[in-house]
């Protein structure tokens, strides 16, 4: 049963939040005013201050906020309810009695970490699956700043020696191992960035009788589905990749005749 997803980047739990039943959320004080979330008769949600609708979506949730009495701000997770873009974020602020909202921002993922510290709101999409993260900052002084990249880094102390610890992990977690990450980059060359886009829904990885760690992913959110199969050979210090778009022939790295026998058997049954 394939139940977990990294996409769209990379978004684990990507479609979980917006489809939950809408629940009452407490009002929040911002700069002497009250931010309220209300549900309409059409089962949409509105964020309102003094009756003014500042944001309306299928789903709205307050992630974090701050208030110093004279001014304050809150960051909201918002979603139109579709699977193509599980969520974005909006900052609503009150200063000198005036309430304003930013345009929605984010990466179309609802897995950001939101925090407020000393009047600065940070919305961080952490690096995952070989992809860089994205960090947004908002403040009264600067408003919403352009996003900054947070480079992906493998976990310290990881190598071929502990690659077997990847068994039971999800396919995209293979890139948390420094040696495995380097091997995929060396194998794929300019196709590495494309490769990271193929991580979608997947099960925890297992190992073949030969000890090759194997995992697969698929993404059926678009018109043309994609499939990914990866193999990791800790003994031979090699990696293997198969990528497929829709009904097209898969692209294999390296050529199939160089794949271990047990992994070639996996290819015969893939995609499922």
Residue ranges and their predicted role:
Residues 16-18:
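N-terminal signal peptide c-region/cleavage motif recognized by signal peptidases
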Residues 22-37, 94-193, 229-272:
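Acidic, small-residue rich beta-repeat scaffolds with periodic aromatic anchors
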Residues 39-78, 178-198:
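N-terminal, post-signal-peptide region of Sec/Tat-exported proteins
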Residues 43-45, 80-92, 130-137, 225-227, ...:
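Structural motif
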Residues 60-99, 217-221:
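Mid-chain, structured segments of secreted extracytoplasmic proteins
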């Amino acid at each position: 049963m394939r139940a977990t997803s990294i996409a769209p980047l990379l978004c684990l739990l990507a479609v979980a939040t917006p489809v939950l039943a809408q629940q009452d959320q407490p009002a929040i004080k911002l700069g002497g005013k009250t931010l309220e979330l209300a549900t309409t008769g059409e089962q949409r949600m509105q964020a309102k201050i003094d009756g003014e609708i500042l944001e309306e979506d299928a789903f709205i949730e307050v992630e974090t906020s701050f208030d110093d009495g004279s001014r304050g701000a809150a960051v909201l997770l918002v979603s139109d309810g579709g699977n193509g873009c599980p969520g974005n974020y909006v900052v609503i602020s009150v200063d000198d009695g005036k309430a304003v909202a930013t345009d929605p921002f984010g990466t179309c993922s609802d897995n950001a970490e939101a925090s407020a510290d000393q009047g600065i709101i940070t919305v961080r999409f952490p690096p995952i699956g070989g992809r860089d993260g994205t960090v947004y900052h908002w403040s009264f002084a600067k408003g919403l700043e352009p996003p900054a990249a947070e480079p992906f880094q493998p976990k310290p102390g990881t190598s071929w020696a502990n690659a077997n610890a990847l068994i039971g992990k999800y396919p995209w977690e293979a890139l948390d191992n420094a040696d495995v990450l380097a091997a995929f980059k060396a194998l794929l060359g300019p196709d590495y960035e494309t490769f990271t886009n193929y991580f979608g829904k997947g099960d925890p990885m297992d190992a073949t009788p030969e000890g090759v760690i194997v995992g697969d992913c698929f993404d059926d959110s678009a018109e043309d589905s994609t499939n990914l199969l990866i193999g990791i050979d800790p003994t031979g210090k090699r990696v293997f990749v198969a990528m497929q778009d829709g009904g097209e022939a898969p692209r294999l790295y390296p050529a199939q005749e160089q794949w271990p026998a047990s992994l070639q058997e996996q290819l015969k049954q893939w995609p499922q």
